[in-house]
Amino acid sequence: MLLQWVLPALLLVLLATGSARAELRIDITQGKVDPLPVAVSEFTGNNAESAQIGRDIAAVIAANLERSGLFAPINNAAFIQRNVSLSALPRFGDWRLINSQALVHGAVSFEASGAVKVEFRLWDVFAEQQMVANAYTTVPANWRRVAHIISDAIYQRMTGESGYFDTRVVYIAESGPPDRRTKRLAIMDQDGANHRFLTDGKDLVLTPRFSPTLQEITYLAYYNNKPRVYIFNIETGQQEVLGDFP
C-alpha cells in the first residue's frame, strides 16, 4: 500500500520538474532574485571585421545582462564549446557542465550592399529548447544599438517585462570652476557609451525632455538672459525655437 502512494508522489515530482524546465523564467516579483547563470558566446563572423563586431556585440550583451542584476554571465574562459554555429544545435551537455542555464549566441555577416546582418539565438540549456531567434540588418556603425536591442529581447523573454537597454539619457553636463559653471545639453546611451554634447555651453540650458518619439529633445535656454524653449533633433542636429518668455 505504501508503494502505491510513493509512486504517484514520485510521478508528481517528475511532472513538476518537467514543467519547470519547459519554461525558464526569472520571477522579478520576488524580494530577492539570485542571478541566472548565462553564457554569452562570441558571435561568429564571415571575415575579420564582422568577427570583431561579433565579439563587441557579445561583450555589450553580457555587460547589459550583468548590470541588470538578474543575470550572471559566465566567464568565456570556462566555455567548452566555442564558435557556436547557427546552422547546428549547440552541444547542450557542454553548457550544462559549466552550469549555464541559458545560452546566447549569434552570427554577423556583411551583405553586398555594405549593410551588416546580425542574427542571434537564445536557448534554454537544460530543456534544450530555443527561446528567441531574431535577425537585424543595419549599417555597421549601429552595432552597439543592435546589442542593446538583443539585450532587451533576452530580458523581456526571461522576465516578461520590457527591457531598458536600448534607451538614451539626456541631461545637463556641468563643468568649470564653481563661480563660472558651464552647462551643456548632453546625451548618452544608458550604459554611458556614445556620449556627446548637443550645445556649446554659451547659453545656460535647463530641464531637457525627450519628445514622445524619442528623436527630439525640448529644453529651456537663456538667450541674452531671456528664457527661450528650443526643440533639438537628435539625428540631424538641427534646433528651432518653440517660444520666448518675457
Features from the language model and the residues they span:
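Conserved beta-propeller blade repeats
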Residues: 143, 153, 157-160, 202-220, ...
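Short loop/turn segments that connect beta-strands within beta-propeller blades
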Residues: 126, 189-193, 233-237
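Structural motif
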Residues: 113-117, 178-186, 225-231
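Amphipathic beta-strand/beta-sheet edge segments enriched in Tyr/Trp
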Residues: 24, 86-153
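Beta-strand C-termini and the immediately following turn/loop, strongest in propeller blades
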Residues: 170-179, 217-224, 243
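Short beta-strand->alpha-helix linker/helix-N-cap micro-motif
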Residues: 29-91, 104-110
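Bacterial N-terminal signal peptides
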Residues: 5-17
